[in-house]
């Protein structure tokens, strides 16, 4: 299983930050016919993204094209278990993608709408945020 992670990061241990507002970019279906859109803000780990991708691919079967529109670029640190507070920030644990409401997470083409709806429904169960199916505006 190849988990997504950046080759290089500008900062090894960045601050957490917070998510404000709605997505102004990556909020329309650009490549496929159907998209999975986030309805609330959140952070997706590379494991969650991979689990959702596998669910989509299994449901869509052959002839389908899947695009992943999110990438986990933010490093997340974690201190070891049973460690007292202080003594600096913890070591790198995993990477997360920051998602705003309206962000398109996955796109799908080459399948009927019912198949896409079921694939995205299963993928949505793997994610910690609410999602919905959107169609291309072409």
UniProtKB/Swiss-Prot annotation:
**UniProt similarity note:** Belongs to the universal ribosomal protein uL16 family.
> Which keywords are on file for this protein?
Ribonucleoprotein, Ribosomal protein, RNA-binding, rRNA-binding, tRNA-binding
Family annotation (CDD domains) = Ribosomal_L16_L10e
Against Pfam families, the record matches this protein to: Ribosomal_L16 (PF00252)
S-S bridge residues: none
What is the protein's given name?
Answer: Large ribosomal subunit protein uL16
| Record's signal peptide | none
Task: Provide the gene name from the record.
Answer: rplP
PANTHER family found in the cross-reference section:
50S/60S RIBOSOMAL PROTEIN L16, LARGE RIBOSOMAL SUBUNIT PROTEIN UL16M
Q: Where is this region: Disordered?
A: 1-29
Keyword field contains rRNA-binding:
yes
């Amino acid at each position: 299983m190849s988990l997504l992670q950046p080759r290089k990061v500008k900062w090894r241990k960045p601050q957490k930050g917070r998510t404000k507002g709605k997505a102004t970019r990556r909020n329309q279906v650009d490549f496929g016919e159907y998209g999975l859109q986030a309805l609330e803000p959140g952070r997706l780990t590379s494991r969650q993204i991979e689990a959702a991708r596998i669910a989509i691919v299994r449901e869509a079967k052959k002839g389908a094209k899947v695009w992943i529109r999110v990438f986990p670029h933010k490093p997340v640190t974690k201190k070891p278990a049973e460690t007292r507070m202080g003594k600096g920030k913890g070591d790198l644990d995993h990477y997360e993608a920051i998602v705003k409401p309206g962000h398109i997470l996955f796109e799908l083409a080459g399948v009927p709408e019912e198949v896409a709806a079921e694939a995205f429904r299963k993928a949505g169960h793997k994610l910690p945020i609410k999602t919905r199916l959107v169609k291309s505006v072409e």
